Structure formats: structure tokens, C-alpha cells
Amino acid sequence: MSALFSHAIRNEWAARNPITSVRTSAKRLSTPDILTASEFQALLLELSQRERVMVLMAAATGLRRGELIALRWRDVDLEEKLANVTHSVLHNVEGNTKTEASGKPVPLPTLVIDELKLWKLKSLYRSEADYLFPSIAKNGEQPIQPDMILKRHIRPALVRAGVKKRIGWHSFRHGLGTMLRQKGVDIKTAQELLRHANSRITLDIYQQAVTEEKRRAQDMAFNGFLEVGSTQHPSAPSEPD
């Protein structure tokens, strides 16, 4: 039952998990760790290309992990700098994202677009129907396992970077929200960028179009992560997963 409510919260169909009122451990109720600008930069420098693109996309867009790995090349418009988030993957099962906010186009910063173009050139799977981040072990027929990426690549990279925080995929989404607040972005624009669908969470109705105001706000917030220095560096190839 708790898992069902957790799934509903991840997709923002529910605001809270009532089961947690019975089990009130600090771990369940704590806010996820987020990275500072310098920590985020240090992490990027330790990641190989695939993982770096995944982290950049997660941090820039606030996509949930299931939405991130469900993306196919046909969902990304590299010219218009948009991602159409229409599906999500949970426990290897791909389904539609039916909420009002989740189906709206997501703006992509120029840096992310540049990294995606480079990744597409390198990836073995680059047709329109292919996943952006496919599992090599599954011959590209399934997306990569996000928890495996965390365990094998991102968390070891954090250790190498000297970052002692416990980071999960939701940390990047939470970090974007924090950076938006720190940069003084108005609540309506921030909620639209984070695509909160539940009225108890969003407090307002979303606009359909990706506006220039939202794009400027996203660029302002995301650039805050990159003020420390450049992300360009020689990358070792990722190991097949």
C-alpha cells in the first residue's frame, strides 16, 4: 500500500502518503540532499558522457527519473530546444503520463542541447524510436536502469569528487526548485517548470505554451549550477550496462 502511495506522489497524483503517519522514521520524512553549485560542478567533472548528460538533464528540467529514462529521440526537438514528456517507466513498465502538467513541453537549456547532440553522435542507438539512454545489455530495447546508474556511476563519482552527501534522482529535481527560489523566480513560473499537477501543490493553473519567461527563468537557475567553471573535460567511455 505504501508503495502505491509513493508511486502516486512521484507522479504528483497525491500530496502525501498517509502510511507514513504510522511509520514516521526520519529517513522517510527528511528532505533529500541537494548539491551546491561547486558540488554539482565537481560531480560533472567526474562523470563520463552518458551519465553527465543524464545528470544535466535531470538538474536542468527537474524530470522525474521515470520520465527521464522513458525519453526517446523523437521526444526531443534539438532545434526548438524542447522535450515532450509523454511517458514514464516504473519497474521496467512504460506507461503514459496523464497529468495536465506532465504532457507539456519542457524547455531545454543550450548547454543540455549541445551535450545531447554530442551524445547522439556517440550513441549506438540514435533513431527516432530509440531511447536516449538505452540499456546496452538489453540491446537498446529497454531504457537504462536509473538506480543502477546511481549505484555504479553517480555515487562513486561523488566520492571521487569529495562530496559526502547521499544523492538520489529526486535530489536534482529538488535542487532545481531550490535554485529557482534562490534566484527569485516567481512561484507560478517555478511551478510550471517543475510541472506540479496537483492543485494543492501547484497553487495555480499552468499555461500550455513554453514562454520566454519560463525559458529565461530556467536558464537563470541552471546557470547558477555552472558558475564555478566549465563542464568541458576529456571523458572516459561509459561501461556497457
Set out the residue ranges of the language-model regions.
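Short, basic (Lys/Arg/His-rich) helix/loop patches that form interaction surfaces
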Residues: 41-52, 61, 106, 120-131, ...
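Non-catalytic DNA-binding core/recognition domains of DNA-processing enzymes
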Residues: 1-7, 22, 108
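Basic, Lys/Arg- and aromatic-enriched nucleic-acid-binding interface segment
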Residues: 10-71, 79, 101-103, 111-112, ...
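C-terminal flanking helix
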Residues: 2-5, 9, 210, 214
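Catalytic-site neighborhood detector that most strongly recognizes the C-terminal catalytic loop/helix
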Residues: 26, 34, 51, 89, ...
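C-terminal secondary-structure termini that scaffold catalytic or DNA-interacting sites
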Residues: 80, 91-114, 118, 124-127, ...
